[in-house]
A protein has these predicted regions:
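Aromatic-rich peripheral "rim/lid" segments of glycoside hydrolase catalytic domains that contact
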Residues: 1, 5-8, 12-21, 206-212, ...
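N-terminal carbohydrate-binding/catalytic regions of secreted carbohydrate-active enzymes
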Residues: 2-82, 86
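Hydrophobic faces of well-ordered beta-strands that scaffold small-molecule active sites
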Residues: 5-9, 41-45, 66-70, 95-99, ...
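Acidic-and-aromatic substrate-binding clefts and catalytic sites of carbohydrate-active enzymes
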Residues: 42-54, 72-80, 105-106, 137-141, ...
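Substrate-binding cleft of extracellular glycoside hydrolase catalytic domains
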Residues: 54-137
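Aromatic-lined carbohydrate-recognition surfaces of secreted/lumenal glycan-active proteins
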Residues: 71, 122-141, 190-199, 203, ...
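Aromatic- and acid-rich polysaccharide-binding/catalytic face
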Residues: 94-95, 101, 134-176, 192-201
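Active-site clefts of carbohydrate-active enzymes
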Residues: 158-166, 187-218, 237-250
Length: 291
């Protein structure tokens, strides 16, 4: 974490249409990663199927240093097996596996469930670091201890934009919030901490979200939170995903309770056509990276 730089990545060609995933094709994944490589050498993914299982091998061919494979539903044997297969096939680049994203927060599983799963996965992948991801506040309580004891490193989501003061606060305060959260997490966890999700959407402007705000926030965060051996952050996210504003509404199973969130479409440092936003110019180029 000290010398590299991670970005949270979902393939631009992997989308949800009427509640069903499309398939990410290798050529599109390669095009995505070629755009990212000058600024990033680490990837954190969210899924292990529908074409995403090809990400580690393509990343390795482009000189990426590390991939943390995400498993969207680690209780689906096909998804977990695909992730484990990709990790075994690419041992030089796959450094970690993330078992789900906010599963406890969404009340789909418990800390105890995930702790047992981590033990099981570690038996199958003894050389790979095992983690899961929750919003930061979920790890503060004593009930999280059973899971924390089984995590080789912590992945955590820290979003200042969800705080009621964010829209009126300067970037200094938003970045300081992230630093303070990570410092508090060290009271409950002694291992490496990687903030998986932290960022600012670039629209809609009426919500206080603009490309300029995204750029200035990341610049301030990098100043206050420089990478260290035991603590760092990943840029969230690589690319815009316009479908994310509508995917719950498009899924009949969730249509009755879904709420539109237009900002969810605009987290990317690049738009859905891989065009850079202003924030990219303020992310330093990596030494030795292709240009």
């Amino acid at each position: 974490m000290l010398h590299g730089r991670f970005v949270a990545y979902s393939p631009t060609s992997l989308q949800m249409v009427d509640g069903q995933p499309t398939r990410a094709d290798p050529a599109s994944i390669r095009a995505d990663l070629q755009v990212l490589r000058p600024h990033f050498d680490g990837l954190i993914t969210y899924g292990s199927v529908n074409g995403a299982q090809a990400i580690p091998a393509i990343a390795a061919s482009l000189g990426f240093r590390a991939v943390i494979i995400g498993v969207w539903d680690p209780y689906d044997p096909s998804q977990l097996d695909a992730a484990i297969g990709a990790a075994r096939a690419n041992p030089d680049i796959v450094t970690g596996i993330s078992l789900g994203n906010e599963l406890v927060f969404s009340k789909r599983h418990s800390f105890t469930d995930l702790a047992a799963l981590a033990v099981s996965v570690r038996r199958r992948l003894p050389a790979i670091a095992v983690s899961t991801t929750e919003p930061f506040h979920m790890f503060y309580g004593s009930e999280a201890a059973v899971l924390l004891h089984q995590m080789d490193f912590m992945l955590v989501n820290v979003h200042p934009v969800f705080q009621p003061w964010f829209r009126r606060a300067p970037d200094h305060n938003a970045a300081e919030f992230v630093v303070n959260v990570v410092t508090k997490l060290t009271d409950v966890y002694c291992g490496p901490i990687l903030v998986k999700e932290v960022g600012v959407p670039t629209a809609p402007p009426e919500g206080g979200f603009t490309p300029e705000r995204q750029a200035s926030f990341f610049a301030e965060l990098l100043t206050q939170f420089p990478p260290a051996r035991e603590r760092s952050f990943a840029y969230f996210a690589a690319f815009d995903a316009p479908w994310r504003a509508f995917d719950e509404i498009a899924d009949p199973a969730h249509a009755s309770s879904a709420v539109m969130h237009p900002e969810e479409a605009h987290w990317g440092l690049f738009d859905e056509r891989r065009r850079p936003k202003p924030a990219v110019a303020r992310v330093p180029m990596l030494e030795g990276a292709p240009r």
